[in-house]
């Protein structure tokens, strides 16, 4: 029997891709009540509205939303707990994307694709395939194409869409299906059928094993689907200039395709963004 030895960098990349697809994080946790979440953060003196970078390592990633969260009526407490559930998941997935992006940038510094050794070429092929691009040695724009796709989603934007799509984490889809972003599927076995679905519709809302899977799928969708090509182009341009707050506002306007209501969805997202001061979450590094 022959054994193939992989070099350290390639092993790292393979593990990274696998973890992004089938992640079972050690810091993930299941809780039965939202009060457990509340107690943990109070015990550690962590205020989600004044979160410091030094506190990020203390954040917990919850696999599911507690069943009793749907009955929490205190609006301020509901928002606080939701942010404590959603922010760590968004941060974690953005960090995974940053690692992939760094690999691409490091390779680009070495020169053209043809200058890469076999280890780097294999790594580049893995990332290229994952992000639905065609790999050829002659493509001198491949690095540019990859960097346009392999990029983070602003935390404020990801929070805003999760708020709308999951009803602050209290929707049936969020509680029963770990679905924070209302992504559709046409496989009835993979999703939950909306109770008020039009008779001529056949879609369901996709279910996930864990909340983190929902966040990862959402980010992957934004970073690869053709409907968000303009979003990705503008992200590449605006990330180089201007204040973060204004950058996010520009990007919000490019998400009309995310919902059937189009422009009204953008208006709704802008309202959620402003009324909840979501831009504050973009300043945490």
List each model region and its residues.
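Catalytic cores of secreted/periplasmic lytic hydrolases that degrade extracellular macromolecules
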Residues: 24-160, 164, 168-285
């Amino acid at each position: 029997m022959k054994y193939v030895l992989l070099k350290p960098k390639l092993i790292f990349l393979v593990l990274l891709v696998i973890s992004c697809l089938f992640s079972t994080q050690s810091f993930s946790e299941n809780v039965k009540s939202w009060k457990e979440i509340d107690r943990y953060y109070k015990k550690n003196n962590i205020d989600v509205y004044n979160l410091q970078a030094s506190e990020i390592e203390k954040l917990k990633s919850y696999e599911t939303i507690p069943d009793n969260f749907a009955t929490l009526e205190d609006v301020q407490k509901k928002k606080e707990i939701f942010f404590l559930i959603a922010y760590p998941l968004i941060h974690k997935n953005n960090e995974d994307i940053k690692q992939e992006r760094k690999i691409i940038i490091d390779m680009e510094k070495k020169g053209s694709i043809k200058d890469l050794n076999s280890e780097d070429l294999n790594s580049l092929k893995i990332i290229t395939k994952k992000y639905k691009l065609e790999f050829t040695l002659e493509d001198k724009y491949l690095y540019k194409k990859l960097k346009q796709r392999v990029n983070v989603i602003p935390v404020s934007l990801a929070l805003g869409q999760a708020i709308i799509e999951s009803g602050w984490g209290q929707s049936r889809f969020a509680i029963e299906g770990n679905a924070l972003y209302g992504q559709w599927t046409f496989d009835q076995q993979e999703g939950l059928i909306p109770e008020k679905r039009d008779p001529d519709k056949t879609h369901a809302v996709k279910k996930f094993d864990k909340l983190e899977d929902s966040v990862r799928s959402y980010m992957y969708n934004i970073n690869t689907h053709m409907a968000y090509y303009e979003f990705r182009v503008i992200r590449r341009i605006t990330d180089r200039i201007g204040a973060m707050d204004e950058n996010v506002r520009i990007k919000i306007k490019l998400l009309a395709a995310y919902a059937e209501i189009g422009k009204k969805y953008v208006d709704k997202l802008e309202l959620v963004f402003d009324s909840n001061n979501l831009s504050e979450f973009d300043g945490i590094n």
